[in-house]
């Protein structure tokens, strides 16, 4: 298999790997896709000899982040020996910026916000609400506990529930997003990041090979954090409101997409314009979430095989989105505002297979003079 040969070298040829992965990473080889995605996301170096050491260093760094950032204020027993000023600053009612309690309250707000979204992640599947240790969770009592955990904020759980807490896949998402937000105060956490992380998590875990040191269980969470962080470097501008009108912001991205549509799908474009449908109304989440909410998890993963290979990330996404509109062109032509919005919002339902969407995208690239090298999807 050529793609396996491509990563079994001391130094990986990134251009070759991108070309091979563009047409889809084979599902038949367990653990292959997570390795390929890590390389494409710069989570693994092109120098394969450095992988083991890099994974271990990232693991240790992430463990430090967890210890330092996921904390609760602790009342000191030797308060009598503490300085009076520090005691005042650490009072629960203190709002001093240096106060441990002030930090705790802000962190709790952030924690609760992320928890609320994480519990809604991928509502079309229950995977993220399952216990990490599936073998430990088989009894009716365990299932009842899991349901109670899901329906109750972690901060509001009773002591008995906390003591017997069953950690779920959603808890891993929660932790990673919280640490990311703490380390990136300029971006913080924005709704939708949970869905992006969920695709990475599902891919890495479900295609896991515990015997492989590169994709084994030990490094899963830390590796997810760093690969998610790398992906967000390229997506973050779309989540920043202050950059909305910049070229790299979400409005800039959507403007580029609309300009392509105007050239290659003029009838659909003019219908949308005539009905004064703001392109943001229907395409905002396409760009922010790399279309992962439009398709099933399996379809999203196949689509991301291609999107992650784009050296001009994520310019290719513009063409995919125009291709998506082409599938509903006949439905919206001569339609009114409501017709346009309804069909554009469910455009994915008109796509038979992801391969059909990508082949249409390739046709649009050629029509728009964005040539790729043999990027026809089989």
Name each model feature, range by range.
Residues 1-186, 201, 211-214, 229, ...:
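N-terminal transition regions in large eukaryotic proteins
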Residues 13, 17, 28, 32-33, ...:
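Alpha-helical interaction elements in eukaryotic regulators
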Residues 25, 308-312:
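Solenoid-like repeat scaffolds
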Residues 42-51, 203-210, 236-239, 294-298, ...:
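Short helix-capping/linker segments at secondary-structure and domain boundaries
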Residues 48-50, 127-131, 241, 270, ...:
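Intrinsically disordered, low-complexity regions enriched in proline, serine, glycine
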Residues 74-77, 218-281, 313-378:
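Extended, Lys/Glu/Leu-rich amphipathic alpha-helical scaffolds
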Residues 129, 156-166, 179-183, 211-214, ...:
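Active-site-adjacent structural elements in folded domains
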Residues 174-182, 194-203, 226-230, 259, ...:
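Contiguous, well-ordered alpha-helical segments that form the cores/surfaces of helical PPI scaffolds
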């Amino acid at each position: 298999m050529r793609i396996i040969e491509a990563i079994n070298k001391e130094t990986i040829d990134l251009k070759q790997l991108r070309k091979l992965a563009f047409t889809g990473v084979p599902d038949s080889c367990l653990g292959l896709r997570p390795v390929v995605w890590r390389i494409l996301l710069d989570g693994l170096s092109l120098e394969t000899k450095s992988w083991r050491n890099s994974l271990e260093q990232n693991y240790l760094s992430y463990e430090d982040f967890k210890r330092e950032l996921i904390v609760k204020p602790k009342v000191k027993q030797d308060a009598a020996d503490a300085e009076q000023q520090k005691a005042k600053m650490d009072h629960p009612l203190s709002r001093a910026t240096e106060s441990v309690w002030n930090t705790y309250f802000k962190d709790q707000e952030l924690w609760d916000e992320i928890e609320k979204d994480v519990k809604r992640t991928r509502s079309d599947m229950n995977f993220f609400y399952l216990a990490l240790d599936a073998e430990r969770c088989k009894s009716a009592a365990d299932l009842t506990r899991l349901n109670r955990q899901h329906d109750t904020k972690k901060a509001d759980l009773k002591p008995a529930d906390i003591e017997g807490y069953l950690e779920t896949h959603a808890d891993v998402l929660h932790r990673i997003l919280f640490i990311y937000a703490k380390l990136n105060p300029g971006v913080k956490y924005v709704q939708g990041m949970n869905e992006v992380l969920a695709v990475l998590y599902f891919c890495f875990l479900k295609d896991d090979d515990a015997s492989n040191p590169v994709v084994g269980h030990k490094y899963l969470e830390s590796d997810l954090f760093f690969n998610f962080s790398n992906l967000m470097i390229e997506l973050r501008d779309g989540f920043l409101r202050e950059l909305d009108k910049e070229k790299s912001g979400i409005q800039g991205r959507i403007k580029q997409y609309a300009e392509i549509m105007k050239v290659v799908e003029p009838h659909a474009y003019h219908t949308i314009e005539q009905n004064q449908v703001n392109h943001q109304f229907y395409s905002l989440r396409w760009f922010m979430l790399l279309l992962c909410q439009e398709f099933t998890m399996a379809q999203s993963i196949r689509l991301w095989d291609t999107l992650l290979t784009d050296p001009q990330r994520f310019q290719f996404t513009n063409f995919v989105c125009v291709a998506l509109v082409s599938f509903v062109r006949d439905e919206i032509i001569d339609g009114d505002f409501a017709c346009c919005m309804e069909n554009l919002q469910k455009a994915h339902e008109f796509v038979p297979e992801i391969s059909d969407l990508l082949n249409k995208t390739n046709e649009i690239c050629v029509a728009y003079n964005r040539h790729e090298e043999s990027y026809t999807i089989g």
